[in-house]
Amino acid sequence: MKITGFTLLETMLALALLLGLLLLCSWSFFSLLQNNERETLVNSIKTAIQYSKIQAIHLGHPIYLLPFGSNENWSRGMVLAELNRKSNKTELIYQWQWSSNSWNINWKGVDSNHRIIISNIPNRAMSNGKFILNNRRTNEKVVVTLNRLGRVRVE
């Protein structure tokens, strides 16, 4: 009687090939996740700036984009606020939150590193500067530049 089946060598070779394909797919999947997270953060920043410009025109006075929380790190999100002239306190208009553990986001502006002033007059100057996104895992760096007219460019 003849016994059929795979030999140990054939089984080990098939498992090694399967492991190689699995490693290749996991690296590709990790890269895809990193790219999607980067694009989501950049698009969120662009959307926040566009929404802020519209709200400033609608409200008729300058408003501010501030980091979410009390620090100068924008990694947790940003807050759109206006200054109440009667109470001299900032009031929340809208907030954006993102949970990005691998990205560090900082704002380097001309007049301030902890706020962006959004003008209510479209052709009047507003804060300009750069959002610098640094990936802690891959050391990737993305720069989102905001010019004085509110246009956004990604480098």
Model-identified regions with their sequence ranges:
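Short amphipathic alpha-helical/adjacent loop interface patches that line ligand
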Residues: 15, 42, 49
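N-terminal single-pass transmembrane signal-anchor helix
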Residues: 1-29
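N-terminal helix-rich module
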Residues: 24-39, 47, 54, 58, ...
